[in-house]
């Protein structure tokens, strides 16, 4: 697809090809469009079927490391399935068409993540990935998925955006980024692509809730309560991830701290 | 099933759509494409184009809501992933048809009031029947309603609109070509995936047949409403096409569609060919998945 034409709506003095040169309404229309999504993903998906460059040699993993990677990827699949089902349910809840179209792009992103992780499991010799995912899923991430889908089923848009686009995306962003540094080359490339998507999803959550809370400051208390409730599940999921990734004891608190700081940095709850 | 579903993966979708027939397009058409001045400057054609585009938006909004709802209901990951691509396809359709309304001069702040004003109530009821199935968590009925009935109707209507726009409005015709390619994929998934589920759940047949009959009734009622109001715009469109052809020193050409000469057929004939074509498609597609097509009553 070609570059979208942004010039007409751009403010004087700003680069008219940059979304940030647009007024607020035009900005949202632009960054939540199919065209914007495609241009964003094109850069890091082009030439990477299944999330990595096909010529990349697959490292020989020792059996223990391979087992750990399979368990880790199975739990990533639970998180991505939660994100996929959550995001798809949220399309109907979105308060306007721009948000609805953005959520549709997120649905496709989450489905792609699920697909590339399942494909990687297949490459690692897992013959029935769906069964393996069920077998190896940690209770905390499964419980988080149920909680998220309950919020979606209840039609609670703000809480669902918070649980999915802030908490779950931050958890995944933190764990995937950490894992990408130590993973085998193919898994690392897959994770880098996924992290690029998560960044966009986080941006949507931060922006949507930030704007909402300006007009509805009392809703902050409710979101803090939800966070308090879900944090224990997130920490449980992180605990599971520690073991799967084979982290040393000294490194473990760092990942939890990274997650909490990442949520804090969004500034939604402060 | 696994092999067939591998043809509906995100990877395949990326290669076929954004990196395939949508490459080098903006809002579904070539960059720089615009609505023809003969349409924008003609009050009758402009209003008719706005009304038509609103029906497309209403249908695609329903498809977006339904396909996203079906992701959660799908029984396996592969179907969820396909429905995720369909969700994004439908969102793209909402976006490109909404953009067309803006290209036709509808102000952004008037979008919803324009949709409310022109959306046909029978089409809205058609959509509600489908969305009720999705809300009830009925995956099989939802996919039949969405991927066979709604998509089957959209596919045929888009083909008709594409045939009538090819000469006068290449920009809109190209936009429609991309959506037709999408709809073809959606209908294919519906047929392939649901056949096996229907044979596993034969008790669902009766309910699904009633849904198809009811949706078909409201589809025919929509066609009847739209065509009964379109005589003037069809005649005006033909006059403009003839004038343009005369200016270019040729004739308007033969726009034939399913045996009907779109340049001379009466509005009633075109409506009849459209209805017969859609219902014929329903009959053969439903037959392939083991559902017996039910003739709807004819709207008054």
Please annotate each region the language model reported.
Chain B
Residues 1-300:
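Non-heme di-metal
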């Amino acid at each position: 697809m070609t570059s979208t034409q942004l010039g007409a709506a751009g403010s004087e003095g700003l680069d008219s090809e940059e979304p940030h040169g647009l007024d607020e309404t035009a900005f949202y229309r632009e960054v939540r469009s199919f065209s914007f999504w495609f241009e964003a993903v094109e850069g890091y998906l082009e030439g990477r079927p299944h999330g990595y460059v096909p010529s990349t040699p697959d490292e020989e993993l020792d059996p223990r490391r391979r087992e750990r990677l399979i368990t880790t990827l199975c739990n990533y699949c639970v998180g991505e399935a939660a994100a996929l089902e959550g995001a798809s349910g949220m399309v109907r809840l979105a308060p306007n068409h721009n948000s609805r179209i953005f959520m549709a792009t997120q649905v496709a992103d989450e489905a792609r993540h699920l697909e590339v992780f399942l494909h990687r499991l297949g490459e690692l010799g897992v013959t029935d990935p769906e069964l393996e995912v069920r077998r190896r899923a940690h209770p905390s991430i499964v419980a988080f998925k149920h909680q998220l889908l309950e919020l979606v089923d209840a039609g609670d848009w703000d809480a669902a955006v918070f649980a999915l686009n802030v908490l779950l995306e931050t958890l995944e962003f933190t764990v995937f980024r950490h894992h990408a540094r130590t993973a085998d080359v193919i898994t690392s490339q897959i994770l880098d692509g996924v992290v690029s998507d998560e960044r966009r999803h986080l941006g949507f959550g931060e922006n949507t809730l930030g704007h909402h809370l300006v007009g509805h400051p009392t809703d902050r208390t409710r979101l803090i309560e939800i966070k308090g409730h879900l944090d224990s599940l997130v920490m449980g999921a992180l605990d599971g991830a520690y073991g799967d990734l084979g982290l040393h004891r000294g490194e473990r608190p760092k990942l939890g701290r990274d997650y909490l700081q990442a949520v804090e940095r969004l500034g939604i709850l402060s | 099933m696994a092999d067939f579903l591998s043809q509906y993966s995100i990877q395949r979708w990326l290669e076929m759509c954004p990196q395939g027939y949508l490459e080098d397009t903006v809002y579904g058409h070539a960059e720089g494409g615009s609505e023809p001045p003969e349409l924008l400057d003609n009050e009758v054609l402009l209003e008719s184009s706005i009304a038509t585009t609103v029906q497309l938006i209403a249908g695609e909004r329903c498809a977006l809501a339904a396909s996203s709802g079906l992701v959660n209901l799908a029984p396996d990951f592969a179907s969820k992933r396909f429905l995720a691509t369909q969700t994004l396809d439908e969102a793209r359709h909402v976006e490109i048809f909404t953009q067309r309304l803006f290209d036709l001069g509808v102000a952004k702040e008037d979008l919803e009031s324009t949709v409310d004003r022109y959306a046909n109530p029978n089409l809205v009821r058609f959509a509600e029947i489908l969305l009720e199935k999705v809300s009830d968590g009925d995956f099989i009925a939802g996919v039949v309603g969405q991927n066979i009935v709604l998509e089957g109707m959209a596919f045929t209507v888009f083909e008709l609109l594409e045939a009538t726009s090819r000469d006068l409005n290449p920009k809109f015709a190209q936009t429609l070509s991309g959506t037709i390619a999408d709809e073809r994929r959606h209908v294919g998934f519906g047929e392939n995936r649901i056949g096996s589920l229907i044979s596993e759940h034969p008790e669902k047949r009766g309910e699904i047949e009633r849904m198809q009959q009811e949706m078909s009734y409201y589809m025919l009622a929509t066609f009847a409403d739209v065509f009964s109001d379109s005589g003037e715009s069809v005649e005006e469109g033909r006059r403009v096409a003839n004038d343009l052809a005369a200016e270019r020193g040729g004739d308007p050409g033969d726009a034939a569609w399913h045996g009907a000469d779109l340049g001379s057929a009466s509005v009633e004939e075109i409506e009849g060919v459209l209805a017969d074509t859609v219902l014929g498609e329903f009959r053969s597609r439903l037959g392939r998945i083991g559902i017996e097509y039910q003739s709807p009553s004819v709207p008054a």
